[in-house]
């Protein structure tokens, strides 16, 4: 057998062990997130806020993966040594601020309870004003950035959320060495990456959510970002230059 593990992270971590030869499911397990309401951190004062604690991802991923492997171990002939890879699936855009060691700020006691230091879940809509401003600025100065994404930038996406953080929680923005999508953070942890500059960024999140395209040199240029806020232009240098398709290992 060549056996991969697939892990899906949304309101819980769901792990599946599959036989590559025939697609047969050998074991499954689910582990919920302990924080917030069914895994989501809410704010009764703001119905648009939806965050998750980054520590929940790793705790639940560990538990669900072990559970799925334990279930697979009951299959005749299965061996953990036959596991050939781990694939992950997440919802996005779910960016999170990280320190210079690629550690989420929310894992630091200083930021543990700060809403802006959490993972900004895909369905967080607190950045509606920022999304509208990005759309209008792009229409006036760089319409090419909007062409691949339907002509409108969303409050659910990368730049609008980071810009909102800069406005409402500049201390968190200043403390972040970089920002990483959940889709990139989990594989980076599994691969032992400890520097945000070394995280392999997936082209799906980068392209659709962060307006990345090789045609214009990657992320939106500094001049465009500076029209939004000069500090976003500075952040660009701490993000990434290249994004990869899903068939590249982390």
Regions found by a protein language model. Give the residues of each.
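N-terminal glycine/serine-rich phosphate-binding loop of ATP-dependent small-molecule kinases
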Residues: 1-108, 233-242
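Gly/Ser/Thr-rich active-site cleft segment
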Residues: 10, 20, 98, 135-250
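A short acidic, often aromatic-flanked loop/helix-cap motif at beta-alpha or helix-coil junctions
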Residues: 35-38, 128-129, 249-250
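Charge-dense, low-complexity intrinsically disordered segments
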Residues: 48-55, 121, 152, 173
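A structural signal for well-ordered alpha-helical segments within the folded catalytic domains
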Residues: 59, 63, 125, 129, ...
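Active-site phosphate-binding/coordination module
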Residues: 75-157
